């Protein structure tokens, strides 16, 4: 729906909402039976009163929109970091200190309701964790912001004193590492913290084997390419400074400054047998050429995040959040073809851009009664992007202004065994470019979450949501670059948003030794952005358009079992069937596949061991069908004292691990490629996790809101 009206500039009091029904739940406290009572402010603004209790056989509680996983003594003592505890949830894959979902949906990670990163979780000890909330569909304010699934980690109260933590991972067979360090000092009413994470990567032996065929002009171009070994490098660094001021349990002020930097260089070199066939005469010529593709980018991004929260009573609470983000980006894409030492084609696309954005959000929560909550929400964002794009000779300046306003409301409650949450949002998205002028769109987005609890061990749930995805700034510029000597890619300044609607029904069961969660998911993407091909001036042109229509069905079963009472051994499995169909763009395509993972873990008092195997499923990519890497790993670690853990492991990519992609029949382009990184075969990794803390426990407040603009403006 389009309108010239704009909701930009909304500055409103927003009502926070409980995404699940209010219920008293039994905390599993500590493994020794220690009593620990606290109020945990969860992601949606919901307040769960965790009553004092000792451990029971139950490790999972069921709510209308999420499941609450409790950690026992074994879980706290045998996992090195909070990030590793996410492996307890079937369907979440933790690899290289990054947490992702095996079903391909996005995963939002929160800490006490505050969006955080995998790197930050790698600097949090499991001893600090009280519980983990897992949302198959994110709560209202996050779902309306485009989040898929979500986890929210609830921690214990911090204390007066300080803490230092190191998390070091280094590969001894290749230049690769995930290293992080943090220090926090907590005074009576103030916490000061600094955190650094760095991920330097250099992978030798990288190459792509490729078959390519397409028409351009009156010729058919066919290339059989063999990848030549090159070095792929990617360096990521992030520093954050935190200041939290807590006047009392009902008031908090938080300010955070972050500085992120990334530099990536991903060249591809290939020796090719090139055949050009005249479609009129059917005459052909064959020659040997060398192709080189250049893909380089760099960005620097500072951000300031200020958050204020005030709880006026048990029934009313107000939160306000302001975020300012800037990006300074540079990128280079090039295609070069040589016959021996003679250049046949040289094309370079350079982009130099800056982006400035601001976010204002406020949340106000109102508890009507113990079983009923009502809320409203609002958020406004605005950004300005400047891009200079050129080929080294001609430079084009493109400015893109975007603004977004969102109003949402939600009502939640419970009756008998039923709990429910119903919400809706009205969203305005507007943008303006020099090439296409002003565009305004208004969207309506409903949200329904239902749950029926049969007993303390089992429940059934249903979720429905509708979300809008906006195109990235880099997609709407004026840049162009070559993928092959007759294949040119152009940006599209007239891209529009597209909508995803998904429905999920599932069942969950748990007892002292078993947890299973089968579910069925169907989603539909309307007006999806996909590549469209055309022929002009003897070239094949690729340009993104809002022409796709995708429908997908997924059926999955996740589970975790502890078969022996006296042996700390557990098996986590996840299996999924995926059926996707995409129409539009002149090349309909579909894919059906099976995928999943299995992880076996031994958790002793001092020693831990873990082995995992991942079988990826196929999915529809931009111009074809892709398959992820098939790999496995094993690792072991030993705990030394209370503060140190050292370990070693090996990751082994199996023969079919190579990431592959191919186009569907009928596509204007026939392509099949396989990528490989031989230097990462049999990667041996050493780990060291050290944490040290001092001080005493005090009361503190949980923080709930944070935002970030994750679109750097790059392609």
Stretches found by the model and what they are:
Residues 28-29, 33-75, 95-97, 136:
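Short, acidic, small-residue-rich periplasmic hinge/interaction motif at the N-terminus
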Residues 41, 52-54, 82-85, 119-122, ...:
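N-terminal periplasmic accessory domains that precede
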Residues 83-115:
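Extracytoplasmic beta-strand/coil segments of soluble accessory domains associated
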Residues 88, 114-139, 181-183:
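Short acidic/polar hinge/loop motifs at secondary-structure boundaries
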Residues 144-151, 159-208, 234-237:
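Outer-membrane beta-barrel translocator/receptor signature
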Residues 168-174, 187, 198-202, 259-265, ...:
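Transmembrane beta-strands of outer-membrane beta-barrel pores
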Residues 236-262, 292-437, 443-446, 453-457, ...:
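Face-selective signature of the C-terminal outer-membrane beta-barrel domain
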Residues 468-517, 524, 541-553, 674-682:
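Outer-membrane beta-barrel signature, preferentially recognizing the C-terminal barrel domain
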């Amino acid at each position: 729906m389009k309108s010239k009206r704009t909701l930009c500039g909304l500055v409103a009091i927003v009502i926070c909402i409980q995404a699940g029904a209010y219920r008293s739940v039994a905390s599993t406290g500590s493994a020794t039976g220690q009593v620990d009572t606290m109020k945990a402010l969860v992601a949606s603004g919901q307040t769960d009163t965790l009553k004092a209790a000792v451990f029971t056989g139950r490790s999972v509680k069921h709510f209308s929109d999420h499941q609450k996983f409790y950690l026992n003594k074994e879980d706290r003592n045998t996992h090195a970091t909070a990030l590793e505890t996410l492996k307890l949830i079937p369907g979440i894959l933790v690899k290289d200190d990054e947490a992702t979902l095996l079903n391909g949906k996005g995963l939002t990670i929160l800490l006490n309701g505050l969006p955080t990163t995998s790197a930050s979780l790698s600097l949090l000890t499991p001893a600090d964790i009280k519980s983990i909330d897992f949302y198959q569909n994110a709560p209202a304010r996050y779902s309306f912001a485009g989040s898929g699934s979500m986890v929210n980690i609830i921690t214990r109260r911090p204390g007066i004193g300080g803490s230092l933590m190191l998390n070091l991972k280094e590969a001894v067979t290749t230049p690769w590492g995930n290293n992080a360090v943090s220090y926090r000092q907590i005074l009576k009413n103030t916490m000061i913290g600094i955190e650094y994470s760095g991920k330097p990567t250099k992978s030798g032996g990288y190459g792509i084997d490729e078959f390519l065929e397409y028409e351009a002009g009156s010729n058919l171009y066919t290339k059989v390419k063999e990848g030549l070994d090159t070095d792929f490098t990617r360096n990521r660094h992030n520093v954050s400074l935190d200041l939290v001021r807590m006047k009392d349990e009902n008031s908090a002020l938080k300010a955070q400054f972050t500085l992120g930097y990334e530099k990536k260089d991903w060249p591809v070199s290939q020796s090719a047998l090139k055949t050009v066939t005249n479609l009129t005469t059917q005459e052909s010529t064959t020659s040997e050429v060398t192709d080189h593709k250049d893909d380089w980018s760099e960005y620097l991004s500072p951000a300031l995040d200020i958050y204020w929260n005030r709880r006026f009573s048990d029934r009313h609470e107000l939160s306000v959040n302001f975020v300012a983000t800037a990006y300074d980006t540079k990128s280079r894409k090039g295609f070069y073809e040589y016959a021996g030492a003679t250049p046949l084609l040289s094309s370079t696309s350079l982009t130099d851009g800056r982006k400035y954005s601001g976010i204002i959000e406020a949340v106000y929560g109102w508890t009507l009664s113990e079983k009923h909550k009502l809320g409203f929400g609002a958020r406004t964002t605005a950004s300005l992007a400047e891009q200079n794009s050129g080929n080294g000779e001609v430079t084009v300046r493109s400015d893109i202004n975007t603004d977004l306003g969102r109003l949402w409301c939600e009502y939640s409650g419970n009756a008998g065994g039923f709990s429910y949450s119903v919400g809706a949002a009205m969203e305005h998205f507007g943008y303006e470019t020099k090439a296409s002028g002003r565009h305004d769109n208004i969207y309506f987005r409903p949200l329904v979450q239902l749950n029926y609890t049969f007993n303390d061990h089992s429940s059934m749930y249903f979720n429905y949501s509708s979300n809008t995805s906006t195109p990235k700034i880099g997609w709407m510029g004026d840049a162009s670059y070559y993928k092959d000597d007759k294949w040119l890619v152009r940006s599209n300044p007239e891209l529009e948003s597209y909508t995803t609607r998904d429905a999920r029904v599932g069942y969950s069961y748990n007892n002292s030794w078993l947890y299973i969660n089968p579910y069925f998911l169907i989603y539909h993407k309307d007006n999806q952005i996909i590549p469209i091909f055309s022929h002009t001036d003897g070239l094949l042109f690729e340009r993104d358009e809002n022409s796709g229509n995708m429908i997908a069905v997924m059926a999955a079963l996740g589970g975790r079992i502890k078969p022996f009472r006296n042996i700390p051994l557990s098996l986590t499995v996840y299996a999924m069937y995926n059926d996707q169909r995409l129409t539009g763009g002149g090349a309909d395509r579909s894919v059906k596949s099976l995928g999943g993972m299995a992880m076996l873990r031994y958790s002793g008092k001092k020693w831990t061991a873990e082995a995992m195997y991942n079988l990826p499923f196929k999915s529809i990519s931009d111009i074809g069908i892709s398959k992820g890497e098939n790999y496995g790993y094993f690792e072991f670690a030993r705990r030394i004292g209370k503060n140190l853990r050292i370990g070693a492991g090996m990751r082994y990519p199996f023969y079919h691990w190579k990431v592959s992609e191919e186009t569907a029949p009928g596509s204007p382009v026939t392509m099949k490629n396989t990528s490989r990184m031989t230097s990462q075969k049999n990667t041996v990794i050493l780990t060291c996790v050290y944490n040290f803390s001092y001080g005493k426990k005090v009361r503190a407040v949980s923080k709930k809101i944070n935002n970030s603009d994750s679109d750097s403006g790059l392609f």
